[in-house]
């Protein structure tokens, strides 16, 4: 039975009572809603065909303002029985089709955060969109303060009964509140309006999902995220429900393509679910810091942007807010080019907002299959070239054959049998390393193993191939990578990247990256321009207007951040708190020695401005995340916001 979990927890029919009174009786049925049930839903002003109420107070009027979806069950709220309609009004697993995995909202404690506006959204009124079932763990007043936002079914654990507490702890899989990792949310101040605070939600163990409650008050909006922990990695999906009334831009931040499926469609005529960002990294705190996240407190998480793990230094959780607008297309197609549209679009920035849509930047092994990367490089005497990083990929025969073909065309000697044998051994050891990384619970030990092995592997490859042959005009070399080849571990996620190194002045043209997400989305990108660090530890790939871009000269350390992003270290206290910390924390990496190309030129060339990916070698991928996150955000903000916030 699809809804066995919640039936077991709730015991069929269950009454939940808080200090504020009875929430309501809940009844579940596996049968699709009947015509009569749909008619009854209409009678209480629910929009047939869209998610409707689940758990709410006995007051049916309140229920109209608290939409939440669990499937196609029928839930009784007071005397009314209200159908829980599938996402598009069908009877199948619409949620699974929507996000690519089984519905995570089968039980009450997971049932907050996803709702849809009523038909009135077409007039710009969002009165129906207020997700319910916020489970408060702090104080009764906190719950009361959230009634308008989350409905009347806030559970006040401070004064709740032992039975209620036991129910929630069973549902959560951990004791409350001490043993739970609280959620994150990112508050974003949209241009032209203040933002209503969003609140940290209790995380549900094992689900790397994020829902985005969205409320519009004169253009205000917010995004909140739950960040669970699973093994050695933490994942964040930041989503935004973007909307726009006639003649107005929709609000959102164009970031990156996340792990969601196919055509996301329109929820209503003016609604669209847009995935913004996917991060999988053990240092999520520092990532969110780059996105403007600040530390919250257990006593009042509303005062700041994040309720953070207390073991994380507060100094690492602060940073600038990010502003932006985006005008979404009518639907997101199943095939998503990168980018979907140039910055500006018809009317230019400020007229319709920046039309920059999901851009894939990282996380290949987690979501991708049959990934290929093809590139054409003109190399100089330094001798490095578009080659696969065999520390991370299994070096395949296609790539070898292509290199040999180029070598032969240049009158060079192809790989010897000995070199082939050594390369084969390297492939085996790399695969073995992946297996090592897929077991065990200590991320530091994994990191240590990974870094030692990858360094040795890279040295071997460098000595035997790169230094022996200066490849010129490398044609369309294909690098294939099996999905989850590295076991899905974060330490390898960040290394499953296109490796370019030590180019120092080379030009790269026509980089083509294609792949299929595990959930079915096909994505691709074609553009030119390359920026890399001359140091082997780091590489930054910047996709410009499709024209070759030479590396800049070395930059003074103090100017590196400002040069790249148009902001200074003083603007990013959570990113770079001091020069001393930067030098030690980043191991003389990206911010010190990178040869950086100024992406402000991208903003100037708004019709063809792309920024694709950042690569980092070591476990402190923090600086890479900062680079890609801020660069993407910079390109996604409106002209006014850019000037006000970044001085561009």
From Swiss-Prot:
Q: What is its main location?
A: virion
The Gene Ontology CC terms held by the record are: membrane; viral envelope; virion membrane
Ordered alphabetically, the record's keywords are: Host-virus interaction, Membrane, Viral attachment to host cell, Viral attachment to host cell pilus, Viral envelope protein, Virion, Virus entry into host cell
Q: Which domain of life is it from?
A: Viruses
Q: Name one GO biological process term.
A: virion attachment to host cell pilus
Where does it reside? Virion membrane
* Signal peptide from the UniProt entry: none
Coiled coil ranges (UniProt) are none
What is the documented function of this protein?
P3 protein is necessary for adsorption onto host cells. Attaches to a type IV pilus of the host.
* Listed name of the protein: Spike protein P3
Organism annotation:
Pseudomonas phage phi6 (Bacteriophage phi-6)
**What is the phylogenetic placement of the source species in the record?**
Viruses, Riboviria, Orthornavirae, Duplornaviricota, Vidaverviricetes
